[in-house]
């Protein structure tokens, strides 16, 4: 288990990094206490998940919706049933969610391997990294809880059966956002063009609009979305600060 922090120039928070087993996070917080509480929340969530897997190994490997109870795994199973994917599709954002809840502060952002959960009292700019030439950013305003989760068929180690550079969901429910990002990414075929992606997004919105604020797909030169798209920002994403293993 390891953690470190660095000053972030020009803003009123510090950037921390925390790693424990598969959990690799970047945390933005205003003080060490919030950071420590966030870590405590993530370790609590991991502990329940690991204990559940020890008693029910299928939970770890299934790609199908799953039935289970529990404070942590219950959120994952609920999301898996909504999205039609396995419960581990929601693991990163669910762990981050508990970190945000345990932090008990007005400003905390946790990026767990590219899945972001935030409680903030001032706007922040969030970037979606799709390679150096295709990355975008958008502004997220003050919120009690917000999640920006991304699945990619081209970047990262998470399972995706699709070919999107990025399939991103914005939602007030992090577990559902994570699971639905996986589901959306799986729907994007290798040869899909703009019209194909827009058709997928329209159907996706009809099915899931009550759970999400916005869905975004980036593939090759196509940028498409449905829902309430945040204000787009020009960003230069530094690959060195991207949260990844």
List each model region and its residues:
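Short, mixed-charge, low-aromatic patches
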Residues: 1-6, 33, 51-62, 134-140, ...
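N-terminal, positively charged, Ser/Thr/Ala/Gly-biased leader segments
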Residues: 1-23, 27
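A general structural signal for short secondary-structure junctions and capping/turn motifs
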Residues: 17-18, 159-160, 206-207
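N-terminal low-complexity or amphipathic/hydrophobic leaders
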Residues: 17-76
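Alpha-helix boundary/capping residues
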Residues: 45, 184, 204-207
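Flexible, glycine/charged-enriched surface loops at secondary-structure junctions
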Residues: 52-67, 107, 113, 191-220, ...
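Conserved mixed alpha/beta catalytic, RNA-binding, or beta-rich assembly cores of soluble enzyme
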Residues: 74-85, 89-201, 224, 229-245
